[in-house]
Every structure is written in structure tokens, then in C-alpha cells.
């Protein structure tokens, strides 16, 4: 009797664990569900009880199927099951290279574990994801006519995209200005405000760009006229009286407080702190609302005096020395 129990009990324990019915898990990162010329897709598989036996990924369209990935995993013995409990595949899907045309398709995923269910074939999990293959770039149609911009000035362009886009707007040299829908009833019509830097001349390339949900990108020029502008040149005299009065308020900046002289404090504020401020304003401007939050032109405060102009080119003199040059923004 003891011998029977010694044999039956371990077998029962093994059967209990090896015949478990918990199916493996599949997680797919596929946002948005559109495949362009090339798309990176991450697929994660897990089976904490019996371990992963095999994974398979295929792409099906119009009755044609191509295997995108297939992988078998090692067995670690009757007690443990599979040697691998979790794994992930990084897939690069390129439809055209595999002979697929644009249109609706199905991504299929399957994973099996090392359980003894289904006549030792294991538990299986199967997942389908409907995707849209789109390898064509969006087309752009400019609706506005006048796009005249001076150096340091701004302009606006109204345009239509042929399909929903992840991003669209105006590229001015190295600067990108996003466009947004919502200003017009037609959701395909977008409005983009853009600017020409004070240091960007009439030869600066200005292009309309769009990237659709599949990552396909298009760009096109549009009629525009860029005007050169001469900015005011100004020389400012920096005195000890001014430095002793103004600089202490900047001692909250560690670099300024550590400076050895008032003149050095001024140079740090006028250069490094100024550049940090420009960078902060640029970062804030990257996250714009998709609506116009003002009405009419921007005006100077009533009864206020004009102290400086945009992009004034300033020379700073201390005694008989030129100590700095900056552009006032």
C-alpha cells in the first residue's frame, strides 16, 4: 500500500500541474492600427505556469497569408515544463516587400504552452488584429493665397489633407510649426501659423508637410514671399550705478550669485540666463492649443512708451570697452 501511494501521489501531483488549463497571454502594441511602408510592432507573450512552447505571427490579406515570425522555445523537463515564461518579439512589418497591396488586412498571433492539454499540444491563445495597410503619402492642397512674411514676422496658411494625419504643418528652415483642424467646419481643413526668424533670410526654405497614420510623409512648397528687414542697431552704456542697482535681484540664480564682480554678473544674466529664457519660451510654444484664443490684433499697453523693438541688435559698452552683443527678443 505504501508503495502504491509513493507511486500514485507524485504522478497525481505531476498530472495536476501538467494538465493545467490556463491559456498563455498575448499583448500587442499596435497604435494606431495602420501599417505604412514599415512599422515596428512589439508582441509580448507570457505563460507563468507551464512556460511558452511556441509563438507564431502571420499577416493575412485577400486570402494570402505570410508568416512574419515563428519561434520555438526549449523544454525544461516534466516538472518545470518550459524554460521560458515570458518573451517579446520586435517585428518590422514591410507590406510591399512581402507583396501586399494597400487595404484592410489581419494580423494573427498564436502562442502555445507546455501543458499536457489537447493531447499534449498544450493550451493555445489566438488573437486577431484588424489593420489598414497604407503605403501612400497624404496629398496636400493649399487653400489660402497670400503668404507674405517679413523677417521676424508671422504668416498663416490654410490647407487640406487627403486623410487624417498624425502631424502636419509648415517647416521653415529648421523650425516646424504644427497646423490644426477645428478652425473650419471641414475636419480635413487645417490652419497653421508660422514665423520667419529674424536671422532667416529670403532664401529660407518654406514647405508644407504632413505625416499620416501609417508614417507616410509628404511635403510640398506653396506660394510665398519672404521680405528682408533691417533691424535697429542700438548701443547701450552700462554703468556701475546701473550694475549696483540691478544685479543683486538676480542673485537667486546660483551662477550669478557666485560671480566675482557686478560686470560678470551682468554678462551671465545677459547671455546664459537670456538663452535659458529663450529655450523655455520655445518649449512652451511647442505645446499649443488647437483653437484661436484671441480676437483682433495684439496691441501695446495703452499710454505705454515704446522702449525697444523686436530683434533690436544691441551692443553693450562698459567704459570704453564693448563687453557684449545680443539680439533683443
Locate the predicted segments by residue:
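Polar/charged, compositionally biased leader and regulatory segments
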Residues: 86, 216-319, 323
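Surface-exposed loop/turn and intrinsically disordered segments
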Residues: 1-188, 193-201, 206-232
